[in-house]
């Protein structure tokens, strides 16, 4: 690994860890510290956390912070394939680190909450606290319905990210783009969060799930109490969704932008 790629992976690690720390810290404050936070407030904190992480890392790594985005950019936006695996490892490790850091600060409150509610860590009931770290679907949703939700919302996320960062699209760029991406995440979360927790990111979900598994929640953290282990859904569905969103933007929007139309006309002549 050369120095440039190493720096990019470090940036991805730190950026992913940063927004996970903010998000998990927010949910910890809500569930074990008694903070009064509504759905929109939670989504805004997640969104602003992502905006700050993008501001931190965009100049070094491009601020992917999400393996699904990395894979989609590789397939549809000329991102080098040799960087996909290192970026993904860095993102998952960063998400694990963000979860660990938040737990180190809130750990005693977790223990106090479990004692007060006679909750055994690793039981199905303990998913209430495991969901602080990663996402699980609403009880009324099947695994397949949850997968569909994640495909749809990740495709929207990816398509809009490409629109917001496309130099030919005529929308605000530079310092506004990270903030707009954060608002996008908050809007998606506010509209669909109660369904699946709006994972949209394999690293965001699997890294903290792995931490929860190691921290005593065990198999229930991975399965979510479902017959089909739920951890598979936030890995596979966001990748499918991101690729779909990138393809839709590239072939239905991007190629029809004026700058690209001119290039096509020049090539044809």
From Swiss-Prot:
Q: Which positions does the motif NPA 1 occupy?
A: 66-68
Cellular compartments per GO CC: plasma membrane
List, in alphabetical order, the Gene Ontology terms for molecular function in this entry.
glycerol channel activity
In the bilayer, the protein is annotated as: Multi-pass membrane protein
Cite the domain annotation text.
Aquaporins contain two tandem repeats each containing three membrane-spanning domains and a pore-forming loop with the signature motif Asn-Pro-Ala (NPA).
State the superkingdom.
Answer: Bacteria
Entry's localization field: Cell inner membrane
The protein's organism comes out as Citrobacter freundii
The protein's job, in short, is: Probably facilitates diffusion of 1,2-propanediol (1,2-PD) into the cell.
Q: Mind telling me which InterPro entries this protein's record contains?
A: Aquaporin-like, MIP, MIP/Aquaporin, MIP_CS
**Which Pfam families did the record assign?**
MIP
This chain's protein is named: Propanediol uptake facilitator PduF
> Is Iron-sulfur among the key words of this record?
no
């Amino acid at each position: 690994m050369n120095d440039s790629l190493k720096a990019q992976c470090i940036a991805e690690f730190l950026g992913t860890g940063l927004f996970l720390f903010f998000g998990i810290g927010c949910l910890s404050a809500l569930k074990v510290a008694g903070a009064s936070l509504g759905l929109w407030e939670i989504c805004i904190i997640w969104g602003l956390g992502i905006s700050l992480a993008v501001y931190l890392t965009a100049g070094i790594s491009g601020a992917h912070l999400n393996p699904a985005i990395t894979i989609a950019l590789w397939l549809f936006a000329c991102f080098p394939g040799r960087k996909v695996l290192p970026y993904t490892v860095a993102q998952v490790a960063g998400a694990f680190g963000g979860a660990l850091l938040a737990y180190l600060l809130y750990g005693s409150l977790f223990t106090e909450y479990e004692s007060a509610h006679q909750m055994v860590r690793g039981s199905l009931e303990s998913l209430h606290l495991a969901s602080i770290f990663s996402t699980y679907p609403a009880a009324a949703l099947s695994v397949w319905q949850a997968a569909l939700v994640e495909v749809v919302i990740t495709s929207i996320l990816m398509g809009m990210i490409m629109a917001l960062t496309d130099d030919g699209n005529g929308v605000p760029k530079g310092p506004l783009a990270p903030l707009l991406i954060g608002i996008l995440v908050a809007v998606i979360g506010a509209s669909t969060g109660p369904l699946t927790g709006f994972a949209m990111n394999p690293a965001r979900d699997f890294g903290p799930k792995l931490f929860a598994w190691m921290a005593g929640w065990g198999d229930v953290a991975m399965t979510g109490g479902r017959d089909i282990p739920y951890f598979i859904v936030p890995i596979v569905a966001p990748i499918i969704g991101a690729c779909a969103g990138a393809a839709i933007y590239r072939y239905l929007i991007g190629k029809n932008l004026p700058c690209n139309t001119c290039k096509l006309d020049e090539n044809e002549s």
